[in-house]
Amino acid sequence: MEHARRIGLPVAFVRMLSESAFFNRATPFVRWIDGFEPHRNEMIFERSSPSCYACEPFSALMNQSRGGIVLAGFAGESSCLSTLIDAFHRNHKVTYLCDASASHALEEVPADEIHRTVSKISGLYGDVHETDDWIASTLPRKLGIGKNAGG
């Protein structure tokens, strides 16, 4: 997130809010994760279903956007995957940062195994990168000097 802020990419936060026992305003589940709170100038969206596209203002923003989004978060097996699939069906470009996301365990399958699988499936719907690789791909490039520099 710090890299995105540093290079001037807009940062948005999306959280689940509903009338359920877990995702209503009175529970700790709707709080931001410590160290990952929005800054005053950043967008906040609230949704009632797993996909970010369940939030009409988010969906409208994506429909007007020319670029794609970089997606990271919790939970990979529900929110991230459903957002990737919705984006794919709308021809929106998504880059999923698999190591900046996490998934829940499902029954007897451990969380890390679920997350590895989600990360592989995500590649069907968007680009999947580790954070360091994505950062390196978005750093400003310096023009080379010498015989192999081109020009």
Regions found by a protein language model. Give the residues of each.
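Active-site-adjacent betaalpha module
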Residues: 6-7, 19-151
